[in-house]
Amino acid sequence: MSVFVSGANGFIAQHIVDLLLKEDYKVIGSARSQEKAENLTEAFGNNPKFSMEVVPDISKLDAFDHVFQKHGKDIKIVLHTASPFCFDITDSERDLLIPAVNGVKGILHSIKKYAADSVERVVLTSSYAAVFDMAKENDKSLTFNEESWNPATWESCQSDPVNAYCGSKKFAEKAAWEFLEENRDSVKFELTAVNPVYVFGPQMFDKDVKKHLNTSCELVNSLMHLSPEDKIPELFGGYIDVRDVAKAHLVAFQKRETIGQRLIVSEARFTMQDVLDILNEDFPVLKGNIPVGKPGSGATHNTLGATLDNKKSKKLLGFKFRNLKETIDDTASQILKFEGRI
């Protein structure tokens, strides 16, 4: 029995692969190029239980056909993590919306064609972006939970890259639930979505620390490189540690109770002030070199904006998430080691 992880070289996916291998699963991953595939198998020590396939372009509806033609009878679990996540785009529809939706439709059609009898569980890496209404995130009277959906339309979400990304996650997840509804008679798999908020935490491998990191971790990285007089970005939201997101993907297919559920993975709220407080307190090398802001004032973050209620998800998952201090400490220390500052 194998677990297939699409986009296995991604930030979250590498941690998923690590946990799967530690739990002795046989893992097949995909990446966009042979070079990325080889780099990842090497990073995992050429583990005999881990192999890679190349899927160059997930926006093509038959992109995953060859994977399931080759391994379909052996794959019981599919974790679809591959999706575009970048705000530096020129065409929202071409660069974000179509690849995200086609990636989901394509992989599910490939399962239907070549692994309808063998795949039992599918876990989709969605996002809190598919849940909340960006236009109303500052409305204190609102609560978003597992039943909530981003109200964006295909047209309205193309107003800017951030809205387009949020829309891409909504339409990709909707496509998955709709596919299952329409194909109940021809596939046996059950579906679960994992909807993380801002994902912080260390890279799986130190070698993957770069000058610029993936979008969420770059928020921490950029704070660490501000000057004391720089303005602190005004940002708040929910946070989760990447290692907890990875674990949530495993629990999502290991438990029967998670079938048909959307799992919002968020530990608590944060502001950039909270992150700065931790950086200044725990890293002497940063103290005096980055802004101080108003220490402790981040505590007001629970009064900011709409409420995120994920009590149901936390209960279903049944494990304790890491707190912000541990997450930021591990993220920052890895970056500082890479830079030779600690």
Swiss-Prot record:
GO biological process: ergosterol metabolic process; filamentous growth; steroid biosynthetic process
Temperature-related activity annotation: Optimum temperature is 40 degrees Celsius for 3-chloro-1-phenyl-1-propanol reduction, and 54 degrees Celsius for 2,5-hexanedione reduction, and 30 degrees Celsius for the reverse reaction.
InterPro entries: 3Beta_OHSteriod_DH/Estase (IPR002225), NAD(P)-bd_dom_sf (IPR036291), NAD(P)_dehydrat-like (IPR050425)
Catalytic reaction(s) noted: (S)-lactaldehyde + NADP(+) = methylglyoxal + NADPH + H(+); 3-methylbutanol + NADP(+) = 3-methylbutanal + NADPH + H(+); 2,5-hexanedione + 2 NADPH + 2 H(+) = (2S,5S)-hexanediol + 2 NADP(+); (S)-3-chloro-1-phenyl-1-propanol + NADP(+) = 3-chloro-1-phenyl-1-propanone + NADPH + H(+)
Gene disruption: observed consequences: Causes hyperfilamentation, probably due to the elevated levels of 3-methylbutanal in the mutant.
Modifications the protein undergoes after translation, according to the UniProt entry: The N-terminus is blocked.
Domain of life the protein comes from: Eukaryota
Applied biotechnology uses: Used as a biocatalyst, because the enzyme accepts a broad range of substrates including aliphatic and aromatic ketones, chloroketones, diketones as well as beta-ketoesters which are reduced with high stereoselectivity.
Keyword set, alphabetical order: Cytoplasm, NADP, Nucleus, Oxidoreductase, Phosphoprotein
Cellular component GO terms held in the UniProt record: cytoplasm; nucleus
Positions contributing to NADP(+) binding: 7-12, 32, 36, 57-58, 165, 169, 199, 216
Modified residues annotated as Phosphoserine in this record: 333
EC top class named in words: oxidoreductase
Entry annotation: catalytic residues: 169 (proton donor)
Compartment(s) of residence: Cytoplasm; Nucleus
Field pH dependence: Optimum pH is 7 for 2,5-hexanedione reduction, and 10 for the reverse reaction.
GO molecular function: 3-methylbutanal reductase (NADPH) activity; 3-methylbutanal reductase [NAD(P)H] activity; methylglyoxal reductase (NADPH) activity; oxidoreductase activity, acting on the CH-OH group of donors, NAD or NADP as acceptor
Description of activity control: Activated by glutathione.
Induction section of the entry: Repressed by SKO1. During osmotic stress, this repression is relieved. Induced by transcription factor YAP1 during oxidative stress, and induced by ionic and heat stress. Induced by isoamylalcohol.
Entry EC no(s): 1.1.1.283, 1.1.1.265
Primary role: Catalyzes the irreversible reduction of the cytotoxic compound methylglyoxal (MG, 2-oxopropanal) to (S)-lactaldehyde as an alternative to detoxification of MG by glyoxalase I GLO1. MG is synthesized via a bypath of glycolysis from dihydroxyacetone phosphate and is believed to play a role in cell cycle regulation and stress adaptation. Also catalyzes the reduction of 3-methylbutanal to 3-methylbutanol. Acts as a suppressor of 3-methylbutanol-induced filamentation by modulating the levels of 3-methylbutanal, the signal to which cells respond by filamentation.
Quaternary data: Monomer.
Similarity comment text for this entry: Belongs to the NAD(P)-dependent epimerase/dehydratase family. Dihydroflavonol-4-reductase subfamily.
Cross-referenced PANTHER family: NAD DEPENDENT EPIMERASE/DEHYDRATASE, NADPH-DEPENDENT METHYLGLYOXAL REDUCTASE GRE2
Miscellaneous: Present with 5458 molecules/cell in log phase SD medium. 'De respuesta a estres' means stress response in Spanish.
Name the record gives this protein: NADPH-dependent methylglyoxal reductase GRE2
